[in-house]
A protein has these predicted regions:
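Carboxylate- and glycine-rich phosphate/diphosphate-binding segment that chelates Mg2+/Mn2+
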Residues: 155-226
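Glycine/threonine-rich beta-strand-loop-alpha-helix active-site module
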Residues: 76-181
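ATP/NTP phosphate-donor binding region
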Residues: 1-92
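Glycine-rich nucleotide phosphate-binding loop and flanking beta-alpha elements
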Residues: 21, 100, 146-148, 187, ...
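Predominant activation on well-ordered alpha-helical scaffold segments within soluble catalytic domains
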Residues: 24, 53, 64, 79-82, ...
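Electropositive phosphate-/nucleotide-binding environments in soluble metabolic enzymes
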Residues: 13-21, 46, 50, 75, ...
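Anionic group-transfer/hydrolysis microenvironments
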Residues: 41-42, 145, 184
Length: 226
């Protein structure tokens, strides 16, 4: 069966082969006229990334890219991304890639309008309320692997470059406005990454199914995926 469908849970998701062709429309829906595509170094020069940039450019949205992203993104990557965002006078982010690109893209969109340091927004208590919610830029997310689920998450994992500890940066508006899930973007992955991200997705579903916080829709989705 070939699935091509739209749904919201609660993020608006466009799923189907070839739907990366809708990237410009997704930006328009999100209110983005001058996006910064954030991805990792490995993906930056790949055909799928260049195709996406071409689609944006053809629609008059430019082809700006930031790819100074480590496998475990840190606050230095975030600061550099925010600097690129401001220098280019962008008004939104296309977070593109696996967990690294998605997490950092979300953080760049979040921090671009903030004045406090990133660690002031760690997922502790109500620290997320410190943020200027109206200053958070819109996000369109495009996952290129099956595993992380960051495209539908309200947080990003950022590594402290000094302590080497991973921290969760949280805000409800980390949720992208639109997600494009195009299976064709995953075809070129190495076998071990395909296997690893598939198991990652499976593990997320096991966790959701076994959670003591019962949610019938989450249980149904978890069972279907497993």
């Amino acid at each position: 069966m070939t699935l091509n469908a739209n749904w919201s849970y609660p993020t608006a998701i466009r799923f189907g082969a070839g739907r990366i062709s809708e990237i410009a429309d997704a930006c328009f829906v999100a209110g983005i006229k001058k996006p910064l595509l954030v991805t990792d170094r490995g993906l930056a020069g790949m055909e799928i990334t260049q195709k996406t940039l071409n689609l944006l450019d053809d629609a008059g949205l430019g082809r700006a890219i930031f790819a100074d992203v480590d496998p475990n993104p840190n606050e230095k990557n975030a600061a550099a991304g925010v600097a690129a965002y401001k220098a280019g006078k962008h008004d939104g982010v296309v977070a593109f890639g696996g967990g690294s690109g998605l997490d950092l893209g979300k953080v760049v969109a979040f921090l671009a309008g903030q004045t406090r340091p990133i660690w002031d927004f760690e997922d502790i208590g109500d620290w997320w309320t410190r943020a200027k919610s109206d200053a958070i830029a819109p996000i369109v997310a495009v996952p290129t692997t099956a595993g992380t689920g960051s495209e539908v998450g309200r947080a990003s994992v950022i590594t402290n470059s000094i302590t080497k500890q991973k921290k969760i940066i949280f805000h409800p508006k980390f949720l992208p406005t639109v997600v494009i899930c195009d299976p064709e973007l995953t075809v070129g992955m190495p076998k071990f990454i395909t296997a690893g991200t598939g198991l990652d997705a499976f593990a997320h579903c096991v966790e959701a199914y076994c959670s003591p916080h019962y949610h019938p829709m989450s249980q149904g989705i978890a069972l279907e995926v497993m």
